């Protein structure tokens, strides 16, 4: 270990920053956040630093660096663009046995400022010992994505109640269990939802109870269409906290690979030919069963759970059975697939509205407004439509939509195997058959679909042509 990590208490202690530019200003802001007594020395200051000096938040020393600026200083930061000045600061600090940092110059520094993830009172510092600062920044970005901004509030809440937690849970095992509940349960969820008063009340109520109720909870998570990079930070956190994951058939293996390794994974996806209502009833029962067993359950759905995902039905069931829940939205297939195909869903020249439509209706009724769907200057995004392509095109054309209207079929959208097949609405079913298009695939109908030919950037793009009659007969 080349450098020894330290966390310094700078509250009220003098720190000198030599330099008056933008880099110096960034260092000053960090030091002020740590409540340091900051002095800034330079021939001239940026407007930001000058304002801080005028407000009395820093003390300005105007002119060229002098060693006596170091009087009573605990630390010094050199942030000028002149290496000779920086070296003079470093030498003067070393002579006085004061730790010094020269920005972006490890050779002249006796301490380094790490990349920081601030969730005060929790702080994470990352250093590459000056060897690879870009790598340290990359790691910081990854760590930032793992820790919600509510984590600081949660740590502060736990610290405030620590004496009472110790009093009410004197047994070490019970106390650890309570902290697990506090950090992973509904109190943390309320803080993530920016509801601190309710979180405080819930913690107070829990402390009054003789023991934890052991109740679990359900998080309804939208997994997006497949690319794990499209997961939200909240979705990633939920996957890492889950005890059990009930996932749909269309959730990609790459997304599941990001989940907590020891979480139970239960496939509950519906398959063609199954009784979907019976399958949904089984999912409802599993959600309640696992939650009542005290588990943290993630219900993982492709796309967004509230866009043709029956998420509303599941929440109604959970509410009726007294199970706590929260919802993490996902990027729905229409948005992601269109973007990955280079298709803008709206365009000032072609489409002023977008309609998301399911082609998988109840078997006993067709409730779609075909006349409304056939209007021009709008984009239609059909979900679950691969088995209904002939009907979709025929009804749109019958209700007035031109057979020359462009379409795009996006198969396995956002995944490495993505294909986009485009053509004319009149040829939709025939083109899909000739290219062997299979689910999962999203159908986009409208003038904007024609832009995929020029704007596509990901995966394969195939320009569909209606097969010749002989080919169709074969």
From Swiss-Prot:
Region (Uroporphyrinogen-III C-methyltransferase): 216-474
The organism's taxonomic lineage, starting at the top: Bacteria, Pseudomonadati, Pseudomonadota, Betaproteobacteria, Burkholderiales
Family label: In the N-terminal section; belongs to the precorrin-2 dehydrogenase / sirohydrochlorin ferrochelatase family. In the C-terminal section; belongs to the precorrin methyltransferase family.
Official protein name in the record: Siroheme synthase
EC numbers on record: 2.1.1.107, 1.3.1.76, 4.99.1.4
Gene: cysG
One GO molecular-function entry: uroporphyrin-III C-methyltransferase activity
Binding site for NAD(+): 22-23, 43-44
Binding-site residues for S-adenosyl-L-methionine, renumbered to this chain: 225, 302-304, 307, 332-333, 384, 413
PROSITE patterns per record: SUMT_1, SUMT_2
Region entry Precorrin-2 dehydrogenase /sirohydrochlorin ferrochelatase, spans: 1-203
Pathway linked to the protein: Cofactor biosynthesis; adenosylcobalamin biosynthesis; precorrin-2 from uroporphyrinogen III: step 1/1; Cofactor biosynthesis; adenosylcobalamin biosynthesis; sirohydrochlorin from precorrin-2: step 1/1; Porphyrin-containing compound metabolism; siroheme biosynthesis; precorrin-2 from uroporphyrinogen III: step 1/1; Porphyrin-containing compound metabolism; siroheme biosynthesis; siroheme from sirohydrochlorin: step 1/1
Function: Then it catalyzes the NAD-dependent ring dehydrogenation of precorrin-2 to yield sirohydrochlorin. Finally, it catalyzes the ferrochelation of sirohydrochlorin to yield siroheme.
Modified sites of kind Phosphoserine: 128
Keywords: Cobalamin biosynthesis, Lyase, Methyltransferase, Multifunctional enzyme, NAD, Oxidoreductase, Phosphoprotein, Porphyrin biosynthesis, S-adenosyl-L-methionine, Transferase
Gene3D superfamilies: Cobalt-precorrin-4 Transmethylase, Domain 1, Methyltransferase, Cobalt-precorrin-4 Transmethylase, Domain 2, NAD(P)-binding Rossmann-like Domain, Sirohaem synthase, dimerisation domain, Siroheme synthase, domain 2
GO biological process per UniProt: cobalamin biosynthetic process; methylation; siroheme biosynthetic process
S-S bridge residues: none
Pfam families on file: CysG_dimeriser (PF10414), NAD_binding_7 (PF13241), Sirohm_synth_M (PF14824), TP_methylase (PF00590)
Catalytic activity from the UniProt record: uroporphyrinogen III + 2 S-adenosyl-L-methionine = precorrin-2 + 2 S-adenosyl-L-homocysteine + H(+); precorrin-2 + NAD(+) = sirohydrochlorin + NADH + 2 H(+); siroheme + 2 H(+) = sirohydrochlorin + Fe(2+)
Catalytic residues of the enzyme: 248 (proton acceptor), 270 (proton donor)
